[in-house]
């Protein structure tokens, strides 16, 4: 499942534009995206993630969440989600609605960032929309989470996946000097491309652990 923004629907319909979801590339298909292994693309309006960032990180929003029966511990965990993480969760909600999932199903995503990175963005939103309130929190919750629809979603068939994969040519071959052979290998030779990358997991974990030990950030947590 690939998550993008509806303001720049490159995968969905070859669209272009700008957006405010950090970490999502604009107007191109990343070289390291295994498109052949992508079953669905889901686009989310960047306004949804912005509004919920504010809901989860403003005192008034957190007080509203308490009225829904959430504990302080649960509310604190919402601050673990940054803009991209919120977008991922919202797309999981759309995914669950699309496939009519129930409490017996499990959907897993990744929280790729934390709200700690976006304190200035929350301040910008407060300046843009004015002081936050319980009424605004209730509106944001209902409009930008509960009201999510199954729009801007596409199950990718084999030809559609290849259409998306071929978009890499214009960025990576024409502009960045990658070869057509390398591009074709990503599609036709998965054993020596994507599978080979996955086989490096143990080595990559060791490098990550060594880096974390060197910088010492995890020791402070």
What is the meaning of each model-derived region?
Residues 97-104:
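Non-catalytic interaction/regulatory modules that flank or connect domains
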Residues 4-80, 120-221:
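Active-site/ligand-binding loops adjacent to catalytic centers
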Residues 88-96:
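Buried hydrophobic packing segments
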Residues 110-122:
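Short, mixed-charge aromatic SLiMs
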Residues 80-88:
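Phosphate/oxyanion-binding active-site loops and adjacent basic polyanion-contact surfaces
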